[in-house]
Amino acid sequence: MNYYSINLAKAHLLHYPCPLNINFLWNYGFLLGIVFFIQILKGVLLALVILQKLSYAYYSVQHILRAIMDGWCFRYMHATGASFVFILTYLHILRGLNYSYSYLPLSWISGLMIFLISIVTAFYGYVLPWGQMSFWNTTVITNLLYLFRTCFMDCGGYLVSDPTLKRFFVFIYFPFIALCQSLFGILPLSHPDNAITVDRYATPLHIVPEWYFLPFYAMLKTIPNKTAGLLVMLASLQILFLLAEQRNLTTLIHFKFAFGAREYSVPTICYMSSMLIWIGCQLPQILHFIWSFIYYIILF
């Protein structure tokens, strides 16, 4: 038995350690726990009635909206709750960056693992409504996995189809993994084009993911090579893990405090991320590519 883990849990439940200058920014973790629990509860209820078969998935979502009592409320609460999860997560990460929480590697990396699991869960949720935007978003994202042949073929290959839908539905337990990780969903898309039945022969003018994936989507649009785009996207997440090692980089710490970089880093990240969200939802144009490239260089 791991007595250290038990004592650590008891210490947090009975005598929670917190700084003297505690303020409202320390509420984000608690709010995330509440929203996450509500998401799991609604996700389980919606999973009871949705049919993950190619011919019925879209119509089962419409059945939830129109035929089931208060089904529309559960569906839209689930979609809105997913946005709240990512809003609170991004604010939580920014708070950690501002207060140099990366100096606590165990807590920092544990939180980033929850963030990555949430991203994977939201991606699986793209497929479930099986609307027009769901289908084409999934086609774009799964094609990025062509470097990993086994995963690529398991996701349905170049043609997203019924096996893809069923295999992704199997991974709806991912929120429970994130919940366990946070202790020691499955979301429908809200884009208007997703309320259209899938048409394999009509590619949308502009494939738009949910807003919390738009910075990554802007990165993929900026870099023409799929492999390079995927590597840069992974690097943008990996760099957060590397922040846990900055305690050993004394030169970087001296630079931050000598030139006041700490005070300007978080506002800069907020501004760059906001601009990348805006660029990600725009039609692909040369000007947007240039600005996106500049913003990503500054962000890195």
From Swiss-Prot:
One Gene Ontology CC term in the entry: mitochondrial inner membrane
Membrane topology of the entry: Multi-pass membrane protein
Cofactor binding note: Binds 2 heme b groups non-covalently.
InterPro entries to which the protein is assigned, alphabetical: Cyt_b/b6_C (IPR005798), Cyt_b/b6_N (IPR005797), Cytb/b6-like_sf (IPR027387), Di-haem_cyt_TM (IPR016174)
Subcellular localization(s) per the UniProt record: Mitochondrion inner membrane
The UniProt record lists the keyword Iron: yes
A Pfam family of this chain: Cytochrom_B_C
Keywords: Electron transport, Heme, Iron, Membrane, Metal-binding, Mitochondrion, Mitochondrion inner membrane, Respiratory chain, Transmembrane, Transmembrane helix, Transport
Cofactor: heme b
Chief localization: mitochondrion
GO biological processes: mitochondrial electron transport, ubiquinol to cytochrome c
Function field: Component of the ubiquinol-cytochrome c reductase complex (complex III or cytochrome b-c1 complex) that is part of the mitochondrial respiratory chain. The b-c1 complex mediates electron transfer from ubiquinol to cytochrome c. Contributes to the generation of a proton gradient across the mitochondrial membrane that is then used for ATP synthesis.
Protein family per UniProt: Belongs to the cytochrome b family.
Further details from the record: Heme 1 (or BL or b562) is low-potential and absorbs at about 562 nm, and heme 2 (or BH or b566) is high-potential and absorbs at about 566 nm.
SUBUNIT field: The main subunits of complex b-c1 are: cytochrome b, cytochrome c1 and the Rieske protein.
Protein name, entry field: Cytochrome b
Gene responsible for this protein: MT-CYB
